[in-house]
Amino acid sequence: MQFFTALAAVGALVAPALALPTQVPANQSLIDVQLSATGNSMIKAVITNKGTRALNLLKFNTIMDENPTAKVMVFDKNGAEVEFTGMLPRYDMNSLSTDYFATLAPQASVEHSFDIAATHNIKESGKYTLSAHGLIPTAEEHGTTITGQAFYESNTLEMEIDASKAAMVPRAFEELDAHIVGTIDKRSGIVTSSCDASQLRIVKQALANSRMLALNAARAASSNPSKVREYFGSSDSSIMQKVASRFQSVARESTASGGQTTYHCTDNRGSCKPGVLAYTLPSTNTVYNCPSYYREPSLTKRCHAQDQATTTLHELTHNPVVVSPFCKDLGYGYRLATGLPTSKAIQNADNYALFANEESSPVFFVPVFYSNG
């Protein structure tokens, strides 16, 4: 990985970034996504490149993600959103490999199938309504440097699901027995039996740094409307209040005495796949760190870069006991996160991590451009 910095032209580089549009119109979509039912709770998604040039699409946190993530929204017959029981990961955007991308030639398609019963709590038989939408980071063909984004919005799929058959589908994350969970420090919520001495020290420091970042961000969200508008698309007083309140909640949770989440230093579920820094199970308010988490810096001074502190902060926003409704992964990185409409931005975990990171960075920061070439 190489870092390219521009010292003399900091102002020239920052200004265009702040001038990016705050919303991505649907008519800019180059991606068509069609959902169809192929079984009781099995879904097939056909993703088509409608453009005239090849698209290199990052699969992380999209309809193409191979991990048990939230690929579709699922609503029951009463219009209530069905509980999601899968994982919400934070991916390492500094070390992208070509394996994480899907390249589609013009008018070409790729299929991806998944069973929603593996990641959703299907309690009753009946009609369910599904849809998918989001932003996909894009790179040049054969490249891994993110250079753009593609919006997608699927058809609305209605399907009948038999709950008894859905119950037979193996869950992506089954409830663990207490002896498998391990020893939990009741003051902090850290599963100490999952940590060696070094990991425990690092996690406690990350929580302390997360608290510091969240408190600084809460103050900024209450007093800096232009900065809230930059990251959340609006400086309305209600938005500023909600953002500040959520940062205060994260600060309360980022403590060594009194956390409501369960925090694992390591993963005992085998879900730390390549590229995952850490992940959360919102259905159980549980956070798991992955090996790559410990290779990140403790607290970076590079604006919009990843580190242990903002990864912990990011994951805490995924927990319903911290933020309700819990934040999802709707857009990754500054460009995609600030391209979301306000209604999505305030529900996107990375907006909070990015906002908190900037508030802790020097005023005259060095922009970072990532290349894995």
Swiss-Prot record:
Example GO biological process: proteolysis
Chief location: secreted
One GO CC annotation: extracellular region
Cofactor(s) the record lists: Zn(2+)
Top-level taxon of origin: Eukaryota
Enzymatic reactions: Preferential cleavage of bonds with hydrophobic residues in P1'. Also 3-Asn-|-Gln-4 and 8-Gly-|-Ser-9 bonds in insulin B chain
Disulphides: 195-265, 272-290
Keywords linked to the UniProt accession: Cleavage on pair of basic residues, Disulfide bond, Hydrolase, Metal-binding, Metalloprotease, Protease, Secreted, Signal, Virulence, Zinc, Zymogen
Entry annotated with the keyword Hydrolase: yes
GO terms for MF: metal ion binding; metalloendopeptidase activity
Residues of the signal peptide: 1-19
Function of the protein: Probable secreted metalloprotease that shows high activities on basic nuclear substrates such as histone and protamine. May be involved in virulence.
Entry similarity comment: Belongs to the peptidase M35 family.
Protein name: Probable neutral protease 2 homolog MCYG_05201
Record organism: Arthroderma otae (strain ATCC MYA-4605 / CBS 113480)
